[in-house]
């Protein structure tokens, strides 16, 4: 409840700030100067009351010998970030255990993604917007709320990629063949994620998780604390475009994957302060996944993978209304190793349904390292974080690795 109350107060603070500035502009053009001045004074008085409340709450619950609350509450930060986001999706086609089929793994491993963004906030509340640099475009939004005893972060991210690594093991006629190749998607694959994290600090009077990550406060002496944390993670992988039909056929006709996970864990964080203004933080939190759901969307098309190469009969034209070829058949075979790609021009695919499965309890991990140095009204920081989320059901496995490193420079106002 304290977190919700602080968020509400911050929103009110920002709205009052905007209203006060708008009212000040109106003062220069209005003819009713007395009434306007009175309204402005009331707004500014209310704004000061809210600011004083937040400032008082920021100082009331900490030991000033260990944690310093800066006098200037506003912070504006310029951030440069390098991100890594890997998705490993593996499955089986046929019956590999019986010696006839294929195990395969598709790995989306985009190169390091660089982004530049701005973070702005008041005390422990802030909002950031970042835009990807270079060829791989994407946008990231995040909201953070931290206090002496708690913290919460919400991160939204989305980007497109058209490359993956495909590793396969083929079982046929008693032979086992291994192979790895680069897969180039003819249409971009869309990847989006939502990450919500919250934690409780048992030793909040002397230890601040925020000191090394958003510089809401300054850690004056070394201290550590047990942490109780929870995360909610959602990821969506979409390669259902008609031009990606070949990969959909290899994926058991799956064209979209949605994963949702809820995790809870207990960890430990420590702030080391070798000299004034400088802090090094390390945090590790193993977590148990108590909710693990994967929903896949199945697609059908007018093509199917042929079991062997050979002459393909004349199928004529495809009728999208009846979902049949001119010869009455519904699927035209294509050899899996056929180099002829002209058939892509006649692909027609459509969604036919979805399947939802739940995985057993899984173990994930959340690791963080942060360094910050504060001087005068300025600060500089270097932070990194690693998250792992995984799903397993029968022959289907999904592993997601989400990591980033960030360099930031900010000023207190």
Across the structure, where does each feature detected by a protein language model lie?
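Outer-membrane beta-barrel translocator/channel fold
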Residues: 81-98, 155-194
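Outer membrane beta-barrel transmembrane domains
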Residues: 89-95, 102-105, 117, 126, ...
């Amino acid at each position: 409840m304290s977190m919700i109350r602080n968020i509400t107060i911050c929103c009110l603070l920002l709205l009052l700030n905007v209203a006060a500035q708008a009212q000040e502009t109106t003062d220069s053009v209005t003819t009713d100067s007395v009434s306007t001045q009175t309204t402005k004074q009331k707004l500014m008085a209310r704004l000061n009351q809210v600011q004083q409340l937040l400032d008082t709450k920021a100082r009331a619950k900490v030991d000033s010998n260990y944690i310093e609350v800066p006098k200037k509450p506003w912070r504006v930060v310029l951030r440069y970030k390098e991100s890594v986001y890997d998705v490993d999706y593996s499955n089986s086609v046929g019956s590999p255990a019986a010696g006839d089929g294929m195990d395969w793994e598709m790995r989306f491993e985009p190169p390091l993604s660089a982004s530049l963004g701005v973070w702005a906030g008041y005390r422990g509340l802030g909002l950031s917007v970042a835009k990807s640099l270079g060829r791989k475009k994407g946008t990231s939004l995040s909201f953070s709320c931290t206090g002496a005893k708690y913290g919460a972060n919400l991160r939204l991210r989305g980007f497109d990629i058209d490359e993956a690594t495909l590793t396969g093991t083929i079982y046929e006629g008693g032979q086992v063949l291994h192979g790895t190749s680069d897969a180039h998607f003819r249409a971009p694959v869309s990847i989006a994620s939502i990450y919500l994290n919250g934690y409780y600090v048992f030793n909040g009077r002397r230890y601040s998780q925020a000191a090394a990550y958003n510089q809401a406060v300054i850690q004056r002496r070394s201290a550590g604390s047990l942490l109780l944390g929870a995360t909610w993670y959602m990821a969506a992988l979409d390669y259902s475009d008609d031009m990606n039909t070949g990969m959909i056929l290899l994926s058991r006709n799956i064209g979209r994957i949605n994963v949702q996970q809820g995790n809870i864990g207990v960890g430990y964080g420590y702030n080391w302060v070798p000299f004034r203004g400088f802090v090094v933080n390390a945090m590790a939190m193993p977590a148990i996944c108590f909710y693990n759901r994967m929903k896949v969307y199945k697609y059908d098309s007018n093509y199917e993978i042929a079991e062997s190469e050979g002459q393909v009969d004349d199928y004529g034209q495809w009728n999208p209304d009846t979902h049949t070829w001119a010869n009455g058949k519904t699927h035209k075979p294509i050899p899996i190793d056929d180099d002829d790609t002209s058939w892509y021009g006649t692909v027609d695919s459509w969604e036919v349904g979805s399947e939802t499965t739940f995985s057993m309890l899984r173990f994930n991990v959340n690791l963080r390292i942060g360094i910050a140095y504060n001087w005068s009204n300025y600060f500089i920081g270097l932070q990194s974080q690693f998250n792992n989320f995984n799903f397993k059901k029968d022959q289907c496995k999904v592993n997601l690795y989400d990591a980033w490193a960030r360099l930031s420079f900010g000023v207190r106002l």
